[in-house]
Amino acid sequence: MEFDVKDLSLAEEGLKRIEWAEMDMPVLRQIRERFSKEKPLKGKKISACLHVTTETANLMRTLKEGGAEVYLTASNPLSTQDDVAAALVKYFEIPVFAIRGEDRETYYKHLRAVIEKEPDVVIDDGADLISTLHKEYPGLAEKVLGGMEETTTGVIRLRAMAEQGVLKFPIIAVNDAYTKHMFDNRYGTGQSTIDGILRATNRLLAGSYFVVAGYGWCGKGVAQRARGMGAIVIVTEVDPIKALEARMDGFLVMPMEEAAKLGDFFVTVTGNIHVIRREHFEVMKDGAIVANSGHFNVEIDIPALEEMAVEKREIRKEVTEYKLKDGRRIYLLAEGRLVNLAAAEGHPASVMDMSFSNQALSAEYIVKHHKELEKKVYRVPREIDEAVARLKLNALGIKIDELTEEQKKYLSSWEMGT
């Protein structure tokens, strides 16, 4: 079996952590049990580009139990958990191509390795795999039945490809499932981002000014958790509706040029480029801490910070100190990459349980229905979204009401008024 991981001797520790995560992923476990009996993915190859974490490991196990031949590479050079990668290879015989801290050349070499397996279905996190597949392997792209995308950033890229008419196969935007973005993006990103910042810095949040750039679902989660820790939260936005929502939610709202003067902590969660840039670094206070929890390391203008610095050193693990000409110091966390995965362990398993259940069921849906789908981006089918929610409620021991026949009739009628 071909693979490329750091050290297979780490596998035993990785296995323990995979099993620990599985305990908090009851929905995916139920799907895996069904997949092992029905084999809905039998004979299909699935290449996945995802963060190599304990939760991802349980998704890979589920797909393999469903009969698929599975290959995994990392969607971020700093998010790979080397013990998990080793465990997948050693104990589950799943080929993994991922090493924490790999350089850009190795990252793309690993991407190409899973593409060259000629997959029938692809799973992506940020659209690097799918875009590389289209640019470098157009012939292989023609043979793909369909794919799934996990993130807001990736969905934006893939919708652009569809609009330009270059997308060669249908995509299911798993990110757009209610049981994904309302929970993973908000509660998962919120908790894990704060976790990453605290692990990296060991700083007190209470009483500090905490700037959140972007008030989408991820930004909402980060802002809520920072406030819960006692921080004074400032939100920056370009969307007037989201800015108004942030204000109504009780947060300070202002442009980044004003927030930059106040902030002790900064977190970008926009999916856009250079949200924090030179003019903002120029007015930040000494000791400002800057982090990213969007997808790529482009939200913070790191080249500008490098140019401004007269000295640079790693002062703590995942903390780089940039000393400016006037003596001020700015601290960049995790090289501007995903702080929740680089400095912590990513989202809790309980929330990834829903996201990855959507992935597994969407893979099954593509295999069954690919002939009916066009080359565009689709939402997760409502029946899958609701099935995941019901399974999660059952796992939590929660029951809900059902509409009566009278209520169903009322909702489908127009004649009854005041």
Curated annotation (Swiss-Prot):
Protein EC: 3.13.2.1
Protein name: Adenosylhomocysteinase
Cell location: Cytoplasm
Family: Belongs to the adenosylhomocysteinase family.
Role, per record: May play a key role in the regulation of the intracellular concentration of adenosylhomocysteine.
Organism: Aquifex aeolicus (strain VF5)
Gene name as annotated: ahcY
Binding site for NAD(+): 151-153, 185, 214-219, 237, 272, 293-295, 340
GO cellular component, one term: cytosol
Chief location of this protein within or outside the cell: cytoplasm
Residues in the signal sequence: none
Cofactor(s) required, per the database record: NAD(+)
Keyword Transcription assigned: no
InterPro entries xref list: Adenosylhomocyst_ase-like_sf, Adenosylhomocysteinase-like, Ado_hCys_hydrolase_NAD-bd, NAD(P)-bd_dom_sf, S-Ado-L-homoCys_hydrolase_CS
Source superkingdom: Bacteria
SMART domains per UniProt: AdoHcyase (SM00996), AdoHcyase_NAD (SM00997)
The entry's keywords: Cytoplasm, Hydrolase, NAD, One-carbon metabolism
Catalytic activity: S-adenosyl-L-homocysteine + H2O = L-homocysteine + adenosine
Keyword Ligase: no
GO function terms (MF aspect): adenosylhomocysteinase activity
Broad class of enzyme this protein falls into: hydrolase
